[in-house]
Amino acid sequence: MRDSLDDDESVPYENKKMEKGLKCIRTYLDTHFESDEERTKYAEYVYKNMTFFVTSLPDNYNQSSLNKYFERMNSTGKNLEGHEIVKVKLLHKLSANKEIFTKAWNRVADMDTPCFKVRRRDDENESGMKERIKKAILYRFSPQELFNDNLLNGLKESEEEASGCTIKNVKESSKAPAKNQRAGDGSHSVMSFSDFLLQCLYRFLCKKGKDTGDITVFFNKANLVDTFEKRLISQGCNQEIEEFFSTLVCYRILLDVYFIRILDGQGDYDYDLETPFLEKDDAVKTLKMFESMLYVNSSPVTYYQWFNMLIDIVNTDSPVEPEILFASLKSKDDETHPKEKLKYDALNYEDVDRYWFWRLDFQIWLKRRELFIVGDDTTPQIRRALNVAEKYVFKRNRSIEHIAPQTPLQEDTLKLEKNDLNSFGNLVMISSEQNSALSNSIYQEKRARVESFLDSSRSGSIESLKMLHAFTFNKSWSIEAIKEHGNAMFNILLNSYDNVDK
């Protein structure tokens, strides 16, 4: 608009499509305003009040999802993404620093790409990488410092911005826009940006002793705008809003540095944990597995449990080493699920808390080389079982399956009383799909199917290390085997409360 008013002739390149757009603007200004003063006033108004929403759509959006998204965008802006509305409302409350906080928000909002590069950049060695990480952690509450030192991915000013290049100078291109303007690293965060916003707000309010209301309502993403309006926007002063923006950046850095991300894959499912502690592979692997366990045991309504545990530990001015973080997370998790609550009789089919199955699988993985001992006389099946345990990946499998079926499809000689049938020793937790496949098959058939998973003669995977242990060490199933297996697994859970280094 300013170029139209100034009629600047010094543009080195003419973009015909851009010129067509500018002509449309000139026509509008000439039609609706009589004087240059009115046109200038209107142009200044548009410049100060217009907001551009630049949104990267997820790769997994299908055509139906895209149609719905653009329908919302076309309905006069009333149904924009909730976090976009929150962003505008928060920025409107600020009296200064809007530009830096806008850039910071835009960067942390992209959960598909780490906002902080933990691994080495092309232009640095290992010591330089560690120094950059230390500096980022030290500056974690200061978006301006992070921006000045180019510590966040995507926050460095481009050459065009620095040289004052305008839209009018942009050269026309015949190439179609790239599918992704910023290439990701092949992973995405364990939570959406809306979930992350709510986690940050919840902790922010709790630290200030403010009311958060009912948790299920608070963490419902459908209430995102209302929650922010009620809890922060309507009550927060300029200083509090700035503090929240800084907190948002801080927590996103800590999340990227210290918590797992989900790897993108073609049908595969695994986690990644970037770390500057390259020499501590075993400690990083243990931490990754434990964080995976915490994650699959949570939902958007309960993310705050592990999120607060994590931030409590890592919100310091120095990097936290993986073995220290694991020990601290486990200690806090032990407090959340105390040993006193662990009762064998409570681990039955009707009452069991699924957390105990995930905790048990983690402990079996942790002690895999003790439980699946490999020696000169080790059977091929145990060797294969150890290999499976080494590569185990936690998933959100929540279907409780009876090893000895409730209603066998074939005549089964094993007759169980209800207490034995529903006892912990006869239960495993797998996916609903695998549960349906195994369903009412008798023990020998289930064991044969598991063995076919191990030797890859049948497609499928081991979804429970408890199940792997049961089928590896029991050729047949009986009341005695159920009790022996149940007691062995229960003792592993009991012993999991010993010191981490044991």
Each predicted region: which residue ranges?
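Flexible coil/loop and intrinsically disordered segments
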Residues: 1-502
